[in-house]
Amino acid sequence: MASINRPIVFFTVCLFLLCNGSLAQQLLGQSTSQWQSSRRGSPRECRFDRLQAFEPIRSVRSQAGTTEFFDVSNEQFQCTGVSVVRRVIEPRGLLLPHYTNGASLVYIIQGRGITGPTFPGCPESYQQQFQQSGQAQLTESQSQSQKFKDEHQKIHRFRQGDVIALPAGVAHWCYNDGEVPVVAIYVTDLNNGANQLDPRQRDFLLAGNKRNPQAYRREVEERSQNIFSGFSTELLSEALGVSSQVARQLQCQNDQRGEIVRVEHGLSLLQPYASLQEQEQGQVQSRERYQEGQYQQSQYGSGCSNGLDETFCTLRVRQNIDNPNRADTYNPRAGRVTNLNTQNFPILSLVQMSAVKVNLYQNALLSPFWNINAHSVVYITQGRARVQVVNNNGKTVFNGELRRGQLLIIPQHYAVVKKAQREGCAYIAFKTNPNSMVSHIAGKSSIFRALPNDVLANAYRISREEAQRLKHNRGDEFGAFTPIQYKSYQDVYNAAESS
């Protein structure tokens, strides 16, 4: 009998692994080409004839913070299908649990804290046992019901420079346990295939109430209430197994604190022991090393994935993009560029977005380029930059300076060049594709390098020698360009020729 069952068991196990591996690969793997996207296009005819820099036009004050809204009714936001919000969370401020109809990327501009995305069906892996002393032994049923004092899903520490990925419909909260305000920029992709509602950001509150950001255009201010307020008290009480009084508390009918509330004595949360010990001892440097080590931990035991290594419940939801050691390209005289995509941040396969952080030194340039498969939402975090954007007709649709706190939407395929000013420049670009690609015009691995000399000579009516210089003036520079004059370009080229 055992000899008959052994093949059946083996076949069943193989089938289980195959099915689960295929599912995980579909959810987290590269199910689509880098050139493709599950994103919906805009249903309206869009004309990006004149781009503009954006700043928040409306702020809503909560008890322990502020939510700042950009003008998402503007055609540029409507056509690209993105929504942008900036939040300031004061020390001991708690952003109440909520979820959104679109996938989001969050960049931490300043501060540190804790966040807790809650994935459905995942276990409460953080557990704290009761400390019982001097009490009689409990019965089995009592022991089971009181086995843990608290249990919840994994919480994640974040710090300045982190990018946090939030899939559509996944509830999350955020708490500032630092000494300075947390400042974060939220970019939500509403044309993402995960959103089957209209292309307008809808925040579903699990607690608290907030003022409607569109209310400033109306005479009567509206308030958004949490989802429990729409249920009857009796039905809610029965469904959750609580008293009517508790059910009314969940509805937060008279709660005027807003979406960011103050926790007077701080949150008591379950955290890894080493992190707590470092906080108590005040060893900042040690804490940073610990956190960085946490960020660098990979779920993969080797360089490849079989689809089972990283699933919903073990997804890394944040990655630091400011760490210089993570830079993909670096020029010591110009700056660095760091990319986050599905290759180094697998959860982006669910979010269907990616991010690029650019740090340019004094007067450095970024190679002219265009985005092949994504729109780009550029947010300046430091300094100033001169930016020019050109459309398909060769018309300049933006020619101006971007400063800290401003935002610019660059449509797909529009050519752009950026030059840092005297104080340098740093910005983060949110892309509407999980594996965004750009095509550089100059420098190494660029369009000019790829074209034959005769093609360039005849296209621009220049000599073959000038075409050769055009291809190689920038030497092996890629991405960030050193700020030098044209005469120096010739010197670089002549030196290369003589060698």
UniProtKB/Swiss-Prot annotation:
Q: Which cysteines are joined by disulfide bonds?
A: 46-79, 122-313
Keywords carried by this UniProt record: Disulfide bond, Seed storage protein, Signal, Storage protein
All copies of the Cupin type-1 domain together span 51-248, 319-468
Tell me the PROSITE patterns matching this sequence.
11S_SEED_STORAGE
Where does the record locate the signal sequence feature? 1-24
Q: Which InterPro entries match?
A: 11S_seedstore_CS, 11S_seedstore_pln, Cupin_1, RmlC-like_jellyroll, RmlC_Cupin_sf, Seed_Storage-Functional
What's the short name of a Pfam family annotated to this entry?
A: Cupin_1
GO molecular function annotation: nutrient reservoir activity
Q: Name one GO biological process term.
A: seed development
Q: Which family does it belong to?
A: Belongs to the 11S seed storage protein (globulins) family.
The record's subunit annotation is: Hexamer; each subunit is composed of an acidic and a basic chain derived from a single precursor and linked by a disulfide bond.
What is this protein for, i.e. what is its function? Seed storage protein.
Please give the name of this protein. Glutelin type-A 1
